[in-house]
Amino acid sequence: MIIVILPLLFLTHPIFAEQFNFTLQSFEVALSMFLIVCSMILINMYIEYRTPLFLFLSTIFSSWSFLTYQSLIMFYISLSIAIVILLLNFNKNLKLLDYLKVISLFLLVFICSMIITQSLIFIGHQMFSIKSTNYLNSKITWGKLPFFEILSILKSHFKNILLAKVIFYNLGFVISTLSCFLIFIKKIILKSRFISFEILCMLLLNLSPFMLTIFMGNVEPIRSQMPSMQFVIAFNFLYVAINLTTKSFLAICISLALVISFRQGVTTANLFYSERAKYEEDVVFANRINIQLDSLNVSDRKDYSLVLIGEKKVNSNLVIQGETLGRSFFAWDLGSPYGTSSRAVGFMRTLGYDFKHPSKEEYKKGLLLKENMSAFPKKNSIIIDNNTIFIKLSD
């Protein structure tokens, strides 16, 4: 029954909903997560059988995963630390040097994988003239903002996590870490072997989901904490459960894990429902726009650029919003060079309304015209100027 805690808390976490909303990443990221787990298994097989092939395959699997999604680097670190902690609890006759040898293997595979990853990226840039984006570097605030301002940003973020102020977080992290602290007190009293080392490992494990946040000095998208965040919560509960000897306390621990899993599952289901409801509302709104355009004798959409000014948010009270889930295509990128037009036009095209994307000049012209326009669907909310359609969505 204890082992059920891990998959239940791990698989039901709402961060997965946010991540797998990116359909084009779904298979690749899921496969890479599986390969990281396989890499861990292969390292342990090497420890037992001393077959170099296992270490080689482990490095290949890790390299593949690191290339696929950067947050899986943190997942590798989390799993490595968790395995060391399990060894400390189940292989208590080992010497400290034995544990350090295991850690050295994890480090060896990690370093080799990072070297392979960076080498392949460099070769790809040179051979195919692929330009690297500035996406990650642009979010790093160290050296760009005052030190204490960065600390304030991080403090606010960690406070939101600990107090579960964001829909993706719950009290599972706080409850599990406090429970681990109580286990540490018990082990210190009983003078357990290598307790200082074990506490250090647990501290690093619980910091691992936030390594990217600390590295950037900024709040990254929630999906970048996937899957380390949910793994750490699940492992904390598992760690507490395997160290409880009283059946009543064990029952309480398992019950708490089940309750948190259920609440996570409900939140995840609500997020997926919200995304579906948002999509259907966007379809209805897109059709309303095109029905009105039909009445204005706009025939072949391919001849027209579509400029949308303002935004249209989801109206349903049943929709809850994540970072991307539940957010209308007609409410994205407000303030960007193309406003909401870019994603909204792309969405329209998936429905068969094959508008052209507007130019920056056309969007700037729309910003000038909006002062004399009403918000859709009122009269004068649509202006057709040559082959450009201007629609004001909001004031």
Description of each model-found segment:
Residues 1, 6-7, 23-27, 63, ...:
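Transmembrane catalytic cores of multi-pass membrane glycosyltransferases
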Residues 1-15, 34, 49-53:
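Transmembrane-helix signature of polytopic, membrane-embedded enzymes
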Residues 1-3, 96-99, 103, 123-128, ...:
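Intrinsically disordered, polar/acidic, low-complexity terminal segments
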Residues 13-17, 69-73, 80-82, 233, ...:
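Short, solvent-exposed loop/turn segments at secondary-structure junctions
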Residues 17-38, 68, 225-229:
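Multi-pass, polyprenyl lipid-linked donor-dependent membrane glycosyltransferases
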Residues 42-63, 92-101, 249-252:
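Short hydrophobic alpha-helices at membrane interfaces in multi-pass membrane enzymes
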Residues 173-178, 242-267:
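Signature aromatic-anchored transmembrane alpha helix within multi-pass, membrane-resident enzymes
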Residues 212, 216-244:
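Hydrophobic/aromatic-rich transmembrane helices and adjacent perimembrane loops
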